[in-house]
Amino acid sequence: MSQPKRWDVPKPLATAEARMADGSRIVLRRHGNPRGPRLVISHCNGFAADAYYPFWSLLTDRFDVVLFDLRNHGWNPVGSGEDHHVGTFVEDHATIGRAIDRNFSDKPKIGVFHSVSAQSALIHASRESAYSALVLFDPVVCPPGCRPEDVEKVDKVLGQLGQAALKRRERFASLEEFMERVLRSPGFQLLCPGAPELIARATLRPASNGDGYELCCPREYEARVSLEGPRWARAADLSRVSCPVKIVGSDPTVPFSFLPTVDLREILALDYDFVPDTTHLLQLEQPAECVAAMMPFVERCVTEAF
């Protein structure tokens, strides 16, 4: 994996703070074209939305792009771990949606989410919906109709990821030290050029003691989300979702090295495609192909909404 490219995330056009029901704060960042249709973008467990810049930078010419990091990730301050779980991620969507409308004007919002943010958005949309439509990249879901072997696989690997997160290093002497670990990891071998450095800058902050860098999301918080993941993966009720949904998966034929892909092709109720030759981190591996996979659905939703 060559790493010559450097991605520099631009300064947001505007920022705002959304305060959750328990007092947790989530920073909203606006990029792109304020007069365009609105996309709301978030990330997977332990990451941050800025790490997805190779993907969302392709959308800023036309779309009004609003980013947010899940609570206790990325730009957000770290709060209590007691409320850091998928259930609060689900509840946060409604508050975040209202804060976006209040601070950046009220217009239809298409949610574009990945992994656990996709999982939580789907569960949220089965109760109410802050979004007019959802594009979900490789959501961690095992809805009725999934193959039993997929359910068993997700249960096993989420447990392994949770245990591994508890053993993660929390501090690094430099960004380069973190990047070296990423480059050695089998799960990150398909990343696009420059992505490891971008991940480092998005998921680390200067250490509180002034010595090197530390994880933005504490490892215990990341582990909790993975360990409780199987229960929430089965909680998604696709029959009750209140808005159009497009699911874009990673390649179910590629041996997984980060998180297993659930093969949703046989669930006929879904608008489902996958991006060939990708793993769970597909938006950081083939960003242009991921945009191409979602655009016909987004265009239809924009036409209907506007």
Q: Each predicted region: which residue ranges?
A:
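Alpha/beta-hydrolase
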Residues: R169-T253
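Flexible "cap/lid" loop of the alpha/beta hydrolase fold
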Residues: A133-R171
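Alpha/beta-hydrolase fold catalytic core
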Residues: M1-S42, D61-D64, D101-S105, E299-F306
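Conserved hydrolase catalytic core segment
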Residues: D106-E149
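Catalytic histidine-centered segment of alpha/beta-hydrolase-like enzymes
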Residues: T278-P287, V291
